[in-house]
């Protein structure tokens, strides 16, 4: 999936869209990537002399990958988006630096109606940087304006 396809599937937009492409997708698994350019604004403040990607952004990238996966499982024509309701067993393993690419792999482990239970892993240059388990509930979204 291209960036345009991703934007069709989920409501996230710049400056808070943390996916560039979807490498593979099935009914229960997605792999997506995001390149992190050195001039990314958040690196100016986290941290100015030793920039690293915040762990919460790694989690958000996994959440957004799951949103693309879940969008394929929801009825067509509905205005719904998954909202994170639970976050468990988060582990940060290695740092992510400017000019690197992160890869998010998310697996759907269980579904109960509009609630989805997932496991995620973020890797960078072959090393796991983050592992997490989380749940989302598909919620109706209203468009402003």
Question: How would you name each of these model-derived features?
Answer:
Residues 21-24, 89, 94, 108-110:
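A residue-level detector for short acidic-glycine micro-motifs
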Residues 44-71, 84:
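Compact, glycine-rich, soluble single-domain proteins
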Residues 1-6, 101-104:
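Short Pro/Gly-enriched beta-strand edge/turn motifs at strand-loop
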Residues 13-14, 112:
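Short loop/turn motifs at secondary-structure junctions and domain boundaries
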Residues 66-103, 129-131, 136-139:
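Hydrophobic beta-strand-centered segment that forms part of the acyl-chain substrate-binding groove
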Residues 7, 49, 92-94:
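Beta-strand-rich interaction surfaces with strong enrichment in secreted/lumenal proteins
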Residues 14-53:
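Catalytic strand-loop segment that frames the active site of acyl-thioester-processing enzymes
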Residues 27, 97-103, 107-145:
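HotDog/MaoC-like acyl-thioester-processing domains
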């Amino acid at each position: 999936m291209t960036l345009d396809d991703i934007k069709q599937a989920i409501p996230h937009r710049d400056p808070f869209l943390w996916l560039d492409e979807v490498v593979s997708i099935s009914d229960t698994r997605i792999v997506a990537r995001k390149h992190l350019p050195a001039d990314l604004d958040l690196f100016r403040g986290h941290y100015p002399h030793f920039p690293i990607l915040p762990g919460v952004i790694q989690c958000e990238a996994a959440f957004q990958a799951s949103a693309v996966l879940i969008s394929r499982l929801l009825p067509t024509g509905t205005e719904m988006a998954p909202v994170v309701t639970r976050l468990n067993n988060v582990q940060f393993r290695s740092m992510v630096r400017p000019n690197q690419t992160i890869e998010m792999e998310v697996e759907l482990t269980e579904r109960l109606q509009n609630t989805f239970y997932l496991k995620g892993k973020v890797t960078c240059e072959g090393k796991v940087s983050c592992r997490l388990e989380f749940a989302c509930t598909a919620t109706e979204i209203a468009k402003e304006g």
